[in-house]
Amino acid sequence: MASKTQKKNKIRQDIIEAASMYEQYLAGQAFLYVYGNEYFEVMFPVNRFLHLAGVETRLFAKKFYKNAREKTLTTQQFYFSPRHPFEVSKKKLSCLKRLYELTNTKVRILRNMETASVVYKVGISNLEFTLCLTENRDSNGEKINEYFLPMSLRAGRNSTKNGDDYGEVVL
């Protein structure tokens, strides 16, 4: 069985690998999703990477991403909590490394995805994981533009439950 230090080092390595993939395929880019007569655009800002990684840190989101991208992130710069437990982070990171797949393969579009705390207007899923999206709004709740932004990453087979709580599958 791996020690606590070994597990944390593995998570660090996964964060670094995920940051590399995010930088290569997603960071700063917008993607257009068209289904039926509808469409939406998703933007992948670097400050959203931290939340998708599922760990806690005292660093600002952009600094966390920069450290991960430059491979200078240390195991002392992130930690786990009841809100962001180790096992969930481990699952999220395996999906975060593959997040770009939602931009170049067939996906399911979900509308009005409801979780315990939030209703997401749109979600994108490959049936292994789901990216929950939110409108791009400022701190006053005013819409900034038409882009949707990554807000949450749901990992595992239950990422698109067949039920009303996960909204309407439209594609």
Descriptions of predicted regions:
Residues K91-L171:
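Conserved binding-pocket/active-site segment within a compact domain
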Residues M1-V118:
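An acidic, glycine-rich, mixed-charge low-complexity segment common to nucleic-acid enzymes
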